[in-house]
């Protein structure tokens, strides 16, 4: 397509090519020399796992991700690092799509929300040696004291375990964020999550529900179940059930080191009747 001095070439597939532009001589000018340029096209493929994180991010930013992929599609990542004292060495896990532009008016537009993760097709939760226990030592805990005081915003899980005390480019040391692949961290975007950020047995109080900016987050009760039983009843007014769970997919997760063993997995909603 030629428009004045601009030549536009539309890509029809991904790959590399050399484009040569030539102009014939006219009645009042001689033919100029040919011009060549090399181009690389990174159009997404419909198999999510075949795309790199830059390509996925570009489709997300353009608002076209759901033209290529579907809720539930998976992409493998390798987690590698020490996460609050628990060593994870080259663990391959599939992240899966929870939804596109989920709750966009509140949480941010042009985003793909993923969950970690699955091993093969089995949903898993990352479990350390502290699973099922309470205490003050480091571990995959909500808090290092047996309380939900301060809600999600000030929790040990949010800031230290997941690493929201830092950023993807400068993650909190020994956090899950720091153990994620650098290519994934390079394209991560924050979302605005609404949660009871007071807790401490204060009950159903609307003003307790405030926002946080999170790169990694646990899901809320309503986001998984589409109903509320134990969360502050006002949380659901700011939340939407994820399309993945709305479609009826299993909510059961299994231990990442023993995929036949079902485990409890954390949600970020504080129990409104307990401290």
Predicted features by range, described:
Residues 1-43:
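Extracytoplasmic soluble-region selector
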